[in-house]
Amino acid sequence: MAEGPYLMGIDGGTGGVRAGIFDRKGEALVFHGVEHGTRFPRPGWAEQDPADWWSCLVEAVRGAVERSGVSPEEIAGVSTDATTCTVVALDRQNRVMRPALLWMDVRASDQARRVQETGDPALKYNGFGPSSAEWMPSKTLWLKENEPETYENAVRICDYADWMTFRLTGEWTASINTASFRAYYDRNTGGWPESLYGALGIGDVLEKFPPRVLDMGTAVGGLTREAAEELGLPEGLPVAQGGGDAFVGALGLGVTEPGKLALITGSSHVIVGQAADPHYGQGFFGSYTDGIVPGQYSVEGGQVSTGSIVAWFKNQFAAAAAAEANKRGVDTYDVLNELAGNVPIGSDGLIVLDYFQGNRTPYTDPLARGMIWGLSLGHTPGHVFRAILEGICYGTEHIFRTMREHGFQPGEAVVAGGPTKSELWMQMHADVSNVPVSVPRESEGPVLGSAMLSAVGAGVYPNIQEAADNMVHTERTIEPNGEAHEEYKFYVDRYVETYPQMRGLMHEMSRHEASRSGSTAVAEA
């Protein structure tokens, strides 16, 4: 039975805004989501209108409250998460000056190269390797060079989550989470890296960022009268500092202790781990001080294309499996999993490189491309489907290996998302990486994580750890099979060796195709 007080979490995702209401034990009463669009003006560009975010947020909150049966006065607090780094520029009247640059926008590829070329000490966060075109320095530099009027007249440049907090409270704050993970903020060295931004010629942007950087869960203020009237919530309702969707999602999976990692799955994999001590090195991002849990360090990795490759295969090449599924009254994925389950480990020598849309880690290479190699006339659709699942697991293990090389030891992976429905895939992840894989009872990690932060900000729980202990619950744990792990090692090694040998051809092909389509973002990368 639901137990008050009730907590609200709001998730600003790529495709829409989702609100959820939970009781103090983490039991979900309701979720309500509202979708919005994305514009793609040119290849490699992606923009959204913050006005759409707000209208969707209002509708999502009102819908959640109405469907929950909970009185607005019974809600103790609210917090938010959103995509990062989705950049908003505002004028002196706090009016949005242009469409927001969405996280997936890579128009700043040339600027990202110049960020790396500075060699600034702040680049330790990515091992002094390639900096991402998605991140704040690259995008703000692009604004200054390509839209100087917007840049000069912008009084505030912030991330999506910071903008939501401002709309709710009227207070300008930045999350330690997004500031450190996406803008090189480091409170151990004084905060914003002035030398990095100065070397790029955008030192003045530091005055445009929100003036206060807060830990997640910190009380920011109360709902303004205007926001309260629009949302149908009480004026003064406590609002807690939120953060990036994947990282707040890690909280919602209970990743609050050293050695634990969140594996947040969907069209991509986001990997976020907690450590007791800092770890730095090329091939992953971090360590970020207090980035998620105060007093701990966070590391991050990611795979650009995972579930999207699985869906691609099902939609393009699984007509026979779909027909069989329709005949039996089951899902197409059920049939594909059965076929893959009858194929031995290693898919009879078939390797899939999951770089279909580039590589996030360990190479941060937007020009990398996917591969299927080792094909023979004896391979079947079941072989290819299994090889896709295995290839994604190999990519995760490659990131884990890179982290291990620099001192971080993954002890447990907590997984959320659609792939948790596949026992075969979850067992593969456990076997390939030789770590237990846990599946939480509540899969809506970002919304729950935001609700947990609201619980801390409202004083329902004294800190994030207490909130996690009370609000996150494990449904099942998959233990690794040692024999299978030993058998997988050979195939993981072949996977790891593939990219270095094919990198030159990948880049040549990617640039050639980009020049044919007119995509300057890729052609200049």
Indicate residue ranges for each PLM-predicted region.
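Active-site core segments that coordinate phosphate-bearing ligands/cofactors
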Residues: 2, 7-9, 113-130, 138-173, ...
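Structural signal for short hydrophobic segments within the conserved structured cores
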Residues: 30-34, 211, 476
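Short, acidic/turn-prone active-site loops that include or flank metal/cofactor-
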Residues: 34, 102-108, 178-179, 267-269, ...
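A short local loop/turn or secondary-structure capping micro-motif enriched for an aromatic residue
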Residues: 37-40, 106-108, 280, 307-308
